[in-house]
């Protein structure tokens, strides 16, 4: 399908230290939990409201995994750019 785009940009905070896991092929992946928030003023009450969304991020690029492992900790501000990929799992 021409003219389509799958691009995501997030600016948020890490909710926990990154998880670094080794895959079966021996390569490492990083798993991140990122919080993004939006605020607005309720029109009827004038009260300030806030909504936080949590995003699960998986990084496969080895160079980026190394940077994540060295520099990112819980609470860090992060900027992420990538593509959405929907996955299913069973508990």
Residue positions per predicted region:
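Single-stranded nucleic acid-binding surfaces, predominantly the OB-fold ssDNA-binding core
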Residues: 1-91
């Amino acid at each position: 399908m021409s003219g389509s785009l799958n691009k995501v940009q997030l600016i948020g905070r890490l909710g926990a230290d990154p998880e670094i896991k080794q895959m079966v092929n021996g390569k490492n992946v990083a798993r991140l939990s990122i919080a993004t928030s939006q605020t607005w003023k309720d029109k009827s009450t004038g009260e300030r409201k806030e909504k936080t969304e949590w995003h699960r991020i998986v990084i496969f690029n080895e160079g980026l995994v190394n940077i994540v492992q060295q520099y990112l900790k819980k609470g860090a501000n992060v900027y992420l750019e990538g593509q959405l990929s929907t996955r299913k799992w069973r508990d």
